[in-house]
Amino acid sequence: MQLPALQSAKLIRRYKRFLADIELPTGDVMTIHCANTGAMTGCGEKGDTIWYSHSDSQTRKYPHSWELTQLANGQLCCINTHRSNQLVFEALQNKQIKELAMYDEIYPEVKYGEENSRIDFLLKGEGLPDCYVEVKSITLVKGNLGMFPDAVTTRGQKHVRELLAMKKQGHRAVVLFAGLHNGFDRFKIAEYIDPEYDRLLKEAMEQGVEAYAYAGQFEISNEIPTALSLTESVPYIK
C-alpha cells in the first residue's frame, strides 16, 4: 500500500479524540486531524516524531492528517486505522493472505448479521463457502508482542458475535489482525484490557471462527516512509 506524501513533525499533544498539535521543523505549531480514537498506547507520546499527510479537500477543517508515529527505537506505527482496510484489500488481491488465497471475488463493506453490521470483506469463490472477514489493526506492541485491542471494544465484541452467527450458518468467518506496527513477531489478545473480547473470541474460535495475525513492513525512501505491506503470518498465542 502506497502511503501519501509525508512530512515529519514533533508531537505536542493529542486531545478531543480527533485532534493533535504538532511542532513543525520551523518551530511553528499546527493542529492536525487524528483518525484513531483508540488509546494509541505507546504510539502517541509527547515529543514523538510523527508523519503527517496533506489533503487538498476544500471541505476539511483540518487539511493535515496524522499518519504514522516513529518511536524512539526507530520502529514505525501507522496510527491512521482507516488505512487498515486498504492494506488488507491489496493483500487479498495479491493473494498474500495464504489462508484466504483460494478466493477470487472480494466485496468490501457488505451489510450482514442481526446487529446492523457491515463486514469489512465478503469473499466468494467457485465451490467455496462464503467467507466473512473482519479486519482489526495491531498498533499496541510490548517487546516483540503485538496485541489487540488497546482499549475496551464493544464494537469488536459485536463483530465476534456476528461472525459466530455466520459460522453457524455454514459460512467461513475470519478475524484478520493486520500489523500497522513493524515491531512484533507474535500476537495475542490483550485480555487485561478487554477480558470480554478475549472470552468471546476464544469461545467463537472453539466453534470454528478463524483468527490470523499478519506482520507489517514499511518501505523507506530517502528516510521517508513510502509504503506499508503485510508480509507473513505470525504465531497467534491463545
Swiss-Prot record:
One function term, GO molecular function aspect: DNA binding
Pfam families: SfsA (PF03749), SfsA_N (PF17746)
Gene3D superfamilies per the UniProt record, alphabetical: 2.40.50.580, 3.40.1350.60
TM spans (from-to): none
Family label: Belongs to the SfsA family.
Record-given protein name: Sugar fermentation stimulation protein homolog
Organism the protein comes from: Haemophilus influenzae (strain PittEE)
Organism lineage string: Bacteria, Pseudomonadati, Pseudomonadota, Gammaproteobacteria, Pasteurellales
